[in-house]
From Swiss-Prot:
The chain crosses the membrane at residues 67-89, 102-124, 128-147, 154-176, 186-208, 215-237, 275-297, 317-339, 349-368, 381-403. Disulfide bonds: none annotated. GO terms for cellular component: plasma membrane. The keyword Transmembrane helix applies. Belongs to the UPF0324 family. It is a multi-pass membrane protein. This is UPF0324 membrane protein MAP_2119. PANTHER family: INNER MEMBRANE PROTEIN YEIH-RELATED, UPF0324 MEMBRANE PROTEIN FN0533. It is found in: Cell membrane. It comes from the Bacteria.
Amino acid sequence: MGGAAGVGFGGLVGHRGGGRDRRAGGGRRAPEGSVVTGVSTVRVAPDETDETADATFTSTRPLDYLPGILLLIGVGVLGKYAQIWWNALAKHEHWTVPDIEYVLWAIVIGLVITNTVGLHPIFRPGVLTYEFWLKAGIVALGSRFVLGDIAKLGGISLVQILVDMTIAGTIIIAVARWFGLSGKLGSLLAIGTSICGVSAIVAAKGAIRARNSDVSYAIAAILALGAVSLFVLPPLGHAIGLTDHEFGLWAGLSVDNTAETTATGYLYSEHAGKIAVLVKSTRNALIGFVVLGFALFWAGRGQADEIAPGVRAKAAFIWAKFPKFVLGFLVVSAIATAGWLTKGQTANLANVSKWAFLLTFAGVGLNTDIRQIARTGWRPLVVAVIGLTVVATVSLGIVLLTSRVFGWGVTT
């Protein structure tokens, strides 16, 4: 992403490597060893081990988060009321228009704020917590799943993911080479597009000793694709005639970042959103294995740190990269499956999940800076677009083949 673009009053602009932010007020420096994506500062230090891709908690003072969290709530609630207002207006005027879900309203409102007046720095710490709310929502969503269903669908989606990942990853690396991108940038784009978006890119950065510039380009490209997926895949799903279950599988297999995957699924329907979250969580669980594979490849070429020999060392590497919120999702599901939750408690957890996702969707919009993404070099973006097209096409073919030909995981 090289340099970054700021917006509005005091919008954040930064360089890689601790460059000085070009703001109206001037003088603020981005943290050393970080890049700026949208309105978020992402640590890409070589010793990065956290499974999250962005600095979710950027301040040690709790009150710093209050303005941004209130903004997330405000945008989310406004999106909900916008849906109600739109439906009432359409009914009153006798318009034949689709029901626009609150998910899209919240994202669009956030996009408009960030890309017009801009996001004031006072809101930034709280807005960046949207990834936390996403993970909290996924954990709470575990109460809606029975472990048997998770095992069945997870096993099916694992096969789909492995086939999709192998085909798409190979094509993306080949296309990146054809466009003259560095081998490691091609690896980052393949990892981000086929597994888990920004989280996977940051997890791989230190493991393969990728340059900060390569990480910046890959992150910007993935963020751009996430925004595109939100607006392209749901209409395509309706045009193709996908069931809620099929679309949830497709979104979970093809959309990169977990937040955008969740939003894309829920834009189609609540059931599609639940399936998308489950499939995406299965993809997330593979981060450690994929990063380990690329690390061993580059280490064999003398261009990455050696991974200590032995099964124990490799298991420790995989655990360090494993997204822990997936375990929380499974634990809550196990508790619900065992019958230890009353109907009231299950309903409360469902409400917690919905509210957490509402804040997440608002954060997706507020964290998408279109002008900054546009400043990314065209080649990584083109490769990423080709990658998204390949992943979406291959995954759609896999979903249709497994559901309509083989009848795997078909639900009524």
